């Protein structure tokens, strides 16, 4: 049997009656969750990577269909939403200067659209227009030009139609976009970890959000990695792996730890660091991405998400926020040790704007109010006005 680290044992043993520990990987989940897990078929399997579609000759042609789908989560059939029937959707890998061509079909029962989160691209024409409507049963074409000077990095795609985006992402509509570095020469093992959360009723349907969750954001009962519960990430002692991590949760902050081991951070979102920076914790807000190097330590470790206060004001007794650590994945390292050659990365190409001249100073007042005590839902305003997609409040020159 592989050794379990002291920190792992403390996590698995210290949660008491409020959590269930199942399987060698240490899956933790709330007893309040009505979705019954059948462990042998679902959790503890090796991490599965999404299918990857790579560009060729400067073009990536891909067809994406958003539709209801039945997937196995924790050994049970779950009725979710998915791109091309997979959770997450296929990974789209492009290079600077490429054109991303997407033939998109909406087979949902609601309006949707597509947003390439993090890409430095235009919203004009058939590109990344978040105000575009693709109604149920309709199809659309996207033509997205990746700038020739686009920095490499990890991004993602998801719906962005106002009023349905959070619900559709929560139900499973998300996938990764990689902008590859044309100068990269390393041969590291790469892992993509798209982390999401979901709540499922006993029927296997996605549970509807409560009033409190709609106001303050909901955190799912189950935390998934590439659509799996507590998968196993394998490696050999001394091996360095590059992990690309996406926080595809709609509200959950991810404060990630790996049994006290260090991460070497390469960059957040599109901001690549000049040199790797050591960190014992990674904090990712919803939509954030991070690229890290992980040196495999022999034995079993647990990648854990520590509860984080995201400012829910203690309303409703804090029911919208998780209060227990969650074992996101197990890292299992065995076999012969390997020596990884030193890895070099190109310097960051991002502009440092901290000393740039300020052309104009603007003051925007963000506020919220209302709620159930006021007889309605929470109202969010900027300069006293609620969001209106047909109104332009600020014009900013590029």
Summary of predicted features, one role per range:
Residues 23-292, 298, 327-343, 356-371:
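Histidine-centered copper-binding motifs that mark active-site loops
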